[in-house]
Amino acid sequence: MKLSACIVVYNGYDEALKAAQTVLRFTRRHPLTLYLVDNASPDGSGQKLEAALHSGLLAAGEGQQVVVRCRTENGGFGTGHNMVLPELDSDYHFILNPDIQLTADTLSDLADWMEQHPDVVMARPALVFPDGRPQQLPLRRCALRPMVYRQLPALRFWAKYNDAYL
């Protein structure tokens, strides 16, 4: 089973480098192509990622490949991810944020789970803060008020609504 993943970067070389390194370090069970797409970062993130690739900072392991693409204009997060779609020959593709930090072979685990559940077309892992607390995401009904309330821990009455997202 072949995997691919894409991280879109805008002015975030250090963060994207760490994310890419954890993806490469932990994704070992299945072949992986990791795409890093720079969205025309004025800080030179794209060129820095290319240099990291050539210097070995983004060292691909056995069965892994790293591809850096630099866009000439910032078309946004979706456009950056869509850029790689024509190149894909993977069985499963992952859209990753540049702040992701893997601590296990999560991509292989998700792909294996998807393989065992062919009726499912999309999945995501549980997201946690560095201290292990779950991150609340507005995945069911995205509205401004709940998004604001989730940021205010003093509003304990809102906890029931937050629990619906776990």
Listing of model-derived features with the role each one plays in the protein:
Residues 22-31:
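Short, acidic, metal-binding catalytic loop of nucleotide-sugar glycosyltransferases
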